[in-house]
Amino acid sequence: MISLAWQKRAIPLYWKILTHKGANNLTEQKAVIRPVIRLLKGQKIIITAHREFHSIFLSHWLKKYQKLDVYFVFRQKKSTMIKRGKKYCNLSELKVNVGETKLLLNQKITKILKVKTYNLLVYKRPHGLTCKLNGRYSNHLRQ
């Protein structure tokens, strides 16, 4: 389901009923997102999603829509690999103090060669690490 966040309310815009249990795949995610991008064409869109939408392939696909003012912010698993210097490490290996936020710009995410760079916001909660991947959205956070 895709909803419009408006004045602390969520207004459903588009949804699909899945015939299977468990996580949806990239094809199903695109099938739900694409009509909403068309519907809101010309509007600035920021897609936020729960961890089921953490796919680097979905992020790669959505980056193509940046010229249409479509941005995204996705939570990432602690096991997500990022490139730090010449080596890769898990997000869980980053040195972040509880309550601290780090903005890592232009990060190579995963070891997949065709994937571009992303901005990554890392925040350590008392009970874990929250990581958000985005398509250049952090530039808008500073405004």
PLM regions: where:
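Active-site cores of enzymes that catalyze phosphoryl transfer or operate on phosphate-rich substrates
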Residues: 1-4
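Single, function-defining residue in the core of a domain
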Residues: 6-143
